[in-house]
Amino acid sequence: LDDIVSFQGGYAYKSNTYVNQSDWQVIRIGNVKNDNLILDIQPVFVEDVIGKTTEKYLLKKDDILFTMTGTKGKRDYFYTAKVPSIKKNLLLNQRVGCLRCFSSEINIDFLCLVLKGEYVLDAIFSTETGNVSQGNIGSESTLNLNIAIPPLTEQHRIVVEIEKWFALIDQIEQGKSDLQSTIKQTKSKILDLAIHGKL
């Protein structure tokens, strides 16, 4: 990966410097979950003066964030999320890594999908360090990942195809949820009819 991205580690913002609201939101491990950047779950902010003095940790559109710490042996981290175009100042906290692509031959969405692949996760978690309960992934392990990069046009095609299949899976899951709801309502109606002697 180090041929196409650079790594930025986070800053150790102190909880006693957090304020209720400001223009500077700190992105912590809990904000990167299940491959989404979630800004409204227990948001924390720092004062303008701290934000401005730690601007080197300011995130940019299309940065790829990943969680570097979790439960050892459980593979409950290395979640990734792409930073969207937003008007907030987002600051990178410790134990959240940032990959910033410097190659014009990379589709960021393709790279995000590759980082979710089983072979990448197997390679990453084979380098896990830490103690009995806490697992860690280092920046070097991440940058040393070997991934196949097809031509840019093929990357675009792969992204479109995968997004098409993911949309179909989402429809199936929604249909399954709707069906379960219908089954539950039907069972309830049958019980109601039986109780009232109408069966």
Per-range role (PLM):
Residues 1-11, 144, 148, 152, ...:
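Non-catalytic DNA-recognition/assembly elements of restriction-modification systems
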Residues 94, 172-173:
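Interdomain boundary/hinge elements
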Residues 28, 54-116, 138-139:
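A short beta-sheet element
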